């Protein structure tokens, strides 16, 4: 019996596609139970439909407050039987109202080597700062912004002529490897959390 994940998106869904592809290739042993989007026109919804994955749209503008929005998201995920919430290009910050219900059961992919360059425009921050190594981080989500315990990281070089766009493209290739890898570790029951550290059973 495969474990079920819910993938939460806002945009084009390239990390969702990577998850779908890894499952199809037999490299990721989970079922995507639902894809939840906060935008009805997100291309990620088309990717999900093409793969035969149920979808749900929960838009903030249709809710009286953030709590109602998060309640509806929670309902969509639980109704689908999701056991892990995967944020794959979800462009909103979740509050403790939602996170407390899914403690250590939400993972996020961030396009920087945390704790450096948190928040928006991480790739641009890296280029502007002049770092020589950048990358991506998969982490559990806590109530801070990109502060949760780190599961794994992938590094890429920053070239002298890099722009935000060229660096972002190089990092994205690693994101497409890192996120399915982290989900598979979870599915195999190999992740444990002690304080800030995530331990991976060998």
Language-model segment annotations:
Residues 1-7, 37-53, 75, 80-84:
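Non-catalytic terminal and connector segments of soluble metabolic enzymes
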């Amino acid at each position: 019996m495969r474990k079920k994940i819910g993938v939460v998106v806002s945009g084009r869904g390239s990390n969702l596609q990577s998850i779908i592809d890894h499952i199809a290739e037999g490299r990721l042993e989970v079922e995507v139970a639902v894809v939840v989007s906060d935008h009805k026109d997100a291309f990620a919804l088309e990717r999900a439909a093409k793969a035969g994955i149920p979808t749900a749209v929960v838009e903030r503008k249709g809710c009286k407050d953030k709590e109602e929005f998060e309640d509806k998201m929670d309902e969509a995920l639980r109704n689908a039987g999701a056991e892990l919430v995967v944020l794959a290009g979800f462009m909103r910050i979740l509050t403790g109202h939602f996170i407390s219900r899914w403690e250590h059961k939400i993972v996020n992919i961030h396009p920087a080597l945390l704790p450096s360059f948190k928040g928006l425009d991480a790739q641009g921050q890296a280029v502007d700062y002049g770092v020589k190594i950048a990358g991506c981080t998969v982490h559990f989500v806590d109530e801070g912004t990109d502060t949760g315990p780190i599961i794994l990281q992938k590094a890429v070089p920053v070239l002298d002529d890099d722009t935000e766009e060229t660096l972002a493209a190089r990092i994205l290739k690693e994101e497409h490897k890192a996120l399915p890898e982290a989900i598979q570790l979870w599915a195999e029951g190999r992740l444990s959390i002690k304080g800030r550290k995530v331990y991976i059973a060998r």
